[in-house]
Swiss-Prot record:
Keyword Repeat belongs to the record: no
Domain of life from the UniProt record: Bacteria
Names of the cofactor(s): a divalent metal cation
Entry's EC annotation: 3.6.1.9
Residues annotated as site: Important for substrate specificity: R17, T81, Q162
Taxonomic source organism: Alkalilimnicola ehrlichii (strain ATCC BAA-1101 / DSM 17681 / MLHE-1)
A Gene Ontology biological process term: nucleotide metabolic process
Lineage: Bacteria, Pseudomonadati, Pseudomonadota, Gammaproteobacteria, Chromatiales
Family, as annotated: Belongs to the Maf family. YhdE subfamily.
Name of protein: dTTP/UTP pyrophosphatase
Active site residues according to the UniProt entry: D80 (proton acceptor)
Chief localization: cytoplasm
Gene Ontology molecular function: dTTP diphosphatase activity; UTP diphosphatase activity
Length: 202
């Protein structure tokens, strides 16, 4: 008989990639909509921004649990990812032309991918993952073909490293899972810090 699936945490994210990554390491979780506006503050660095948004998502999720007696009060994980090129923060493309421009700007360059992850209950803890990704030179035609697949449209920086854009990546230094949207090493550190024994289901 299969053991009962009981969540260790809530994941405050609508991202299927983050859910897939937690599944990979055996974390039992329930997910919720974070409902947080991702607006860069004036003079806010990308590092501070991703940690703040990750923490705001986790805090908002935990507050919603406190207000809902029907749901079990568990720690809430939040995460946020941004792509940074020449100190410019690249979020999700606003449309086709913006997405094509974004991908063209990444062609033949090295950019940073920052992912902040937070875990909140009556405690709060955060971690930051910083990765460097180098794209080969991209042809305009392949950028347009890639956009037409629909894959880039909801991704920070306009690409998914685990998808078709894998063929653009010449070099990666850092966390592959962090570039996907949830750095598993840092996420596991937070789970360990909160004494959540996710490995018991391995």
């Amino acid at each position: 008989m299969q053991p009962e699936y009981r969540p260790h945490i809530y994941l405050a994210s609508n991202s299927p990639r983050r859910r897939e990554l937690l599944d990979r390491i055996g974390v039992h979780y329930a997910w919720m909509d974070p409902g947080v506006d991702e607006v860069l503050g004036e003079d806010e660095s990308p590092e501070v921004f991703v940690l703040r948004i990750a923490l705001e998502k986790a805090r908002a999720g935990y507050r919603s649990l406190q207000e809902d007696p029907e749901r079990e009060l568990l720690p809430v994980m939040g995460a946020d990812t941004v792509v940074v090129l020449d100190n410019e923060l690249l979020g999700k493309p606003r449309g086709r032309e913006h997405g094509l421009e974004m991908l063209q700007s990444l062609s033949g360059t090295t950019h940073r991918v920052l992912t902040g992850v937070a875990l909140v209950d009556d405690r709060e803890a955060t971690r930051l993952s910083v990765s460097h990704v180098t794209f080969r030179e991209l042809e305009r035609a392949e950028i347009e073909r890639y956009w037409a697949t629909g894959e880039p449209q909801d991704k920070a920086g306009g690409y998914a490293i685990q998808g078709r854009a894998a063929v653009f990546v010449e070099h990666l230094e850092g966390s592959y899972s962090g570039v996907m949207g949830l750095p598993l090493f840092e996420a596991a550190q937070l789970l360990d810090e909160f004494e959540i024994d996710y490995q018991r289901h391995w």
